């Protein structure tokens, strides 16, 4: 069946890819020799682990990666094929695809989960393959050429149950089966973060656990008519390289916390134990303001269509001391600002474990996409009772250039470009610390005891006491296991709402250095404008109903931002001016501190109560209402798609040891060729870890 040209165009890699270099040299040079060695070895571990992302994205991503590692390692490739085999433009299209692929560590966008295909035709790429006539190139081209270009309906997006593909699951499994196995896992307190689930035969399933070790015997369990086999050794070749390089970092740890953290990482990745990984996070949160900050593992569940399994990521970074001082002040005043959030103190943890909050310059972020900020650990039991860390990734946030901004008024263009970086730093800071770092979950322990005073804590939405039977997380349940695929968009919405709710606060603005009233007002105005515009742009990440399949949001943050746009529109602080080919966001600055803050606060309170009380049914109803895309917004979506711009990809530095054992840092051009060069330098043609 032929694919409509409009569909093909939506999935073609853009001709121009915005490539930015993550500048880390200045911060790296300030490290001691020992710190540089520590950073280097963990960086190598992160990168080798990142090849797991290829297999977590699609079955063809691994062969595509190896195809490019071999193809672009060929000397004088461009002069060999241009202009005799392909044109300059066609070769540039190939570079754009390869850079986008490397930037996403797979052939599906990390932000949006939709497949992208080369703009250079398959026939022309075949001519390049024929010309170089390399055995490895031919081998990997044979393994990936069909799927690389396929836009069959089933493979256009990530998903399950016939609505996309996912390598976290076998193609023959249903959501009902996944849910049943999840109930088994909850009953045994087995974390899904480092697992995949494959159906072997009727009522027979392999639960794969990621581990370097393959010697742990398979154990079979019977559960409600299912046979569930727990099989260790998933991603064993990749994790063996991770473990080997983490061991090399051990002699260069700065303190006991780092040593113990590394040992627990090694134990976890070798054995597959999530409990060991939890212990690594306990040591990590105790390692306050290290010169080299790092974390590694199966962390975020955004890309699991079911919402519980973690994607590999690892980062290494250096502290930006000047910006970290601002975040430190935010942390020091946490008690004051948490009390300003729109819920009763009984919905807040009894003790706020003051987190480490630093601004970092990223040396390495090895995964499918780089965030602007992070709040870890993601383990609820650690975050709720022991603490967490916040980081803002300064050189990621700062990687932008002045440009014409779509969907805002001409009168806002100059202000938006001038203040968007500062406004975004403010939003990220509040989002991570007071968003992800706030709130309490009402839970039940193994003995049936709850963590609140029965009869005294009132649900503000019902004005009745919290029910210790129905409004709590049962023992073994977690936020992710209860909220599943809704968990990420709901939590991102809650954190984003905290950011915009508190950003007009004078005291917070002063902490960030915005003491001039006019500039302070402009900063929070731009912050709210960024959010309103993001709600419009979010429509790019919505797939409308098609051939019986329901509409689907493909990105948690963007679903959250559309939800917030709905809140803005309902309150009247935002209006949309629509024409045949454009839509303009108009935000009433005079209403932000009054009507706007109240509307966001009321909505935020609902999110917090639903999260605290494990109320998944009310949450589904709320999100169905606030993120429904009607005919009016489907028309706006067409405008958004016509004006969409590709997301930036980041070229990262490479570290290596010279003949004297010193760490050297190599930078690359901020171009598609620079992105390719960085990956060829980093990995070469080593495919020994590919399954």
From Swiss-Prot:
Gene3D superfamilies assigned to the protein according to its UniProt record, in alphabetical order: 3.30.540.30
Catalysed reaction equations from the record: Release of an N-terminal dipeptide from a peptide comprising four or more residues, with broad specificity. Also acts on dipeptidyl 2-naphthylamides
Positions of Zn(2+) binding: 431, 436, 492
GO terms of biological process kind: proteolysis
Cofactors that this protein relies on: Zn(2+)
Signal peptide interval: none
An example Gene Ontology CC term for this record: cytoplasm
Source species, domain of life: Eukaryota
UniProt KW keywords: Aminopeptidase, Cytoplasm, Hydrolase, Metal-binding, Metalloprotease, Protease, Zinc
S-adenosyl-L-methionine found in the keyword field: no
Residue pairs linked by disulfide bridges in the UniProt entry: none
Localisation: Cytoplasm
InterPro entries: Dipeptidyl-peptase3, Peptidase_M49
EC number: 3.4.14.4
Cofactor note: Binds 1 zinc ion per subunit.
Keyword Signal listed: no
UniProt xrefs under PANTHER family: DIPEPTIDYL PEPTIDASE 3, DIPEPTIDYL PEPTIDASE III-RELATED
Family: Belongs to the peptidase M49 family.
Protein name per UniProt: Dipeptidyl peptidase 3
Native source organism of the sequence: Dictyostelium discoideum
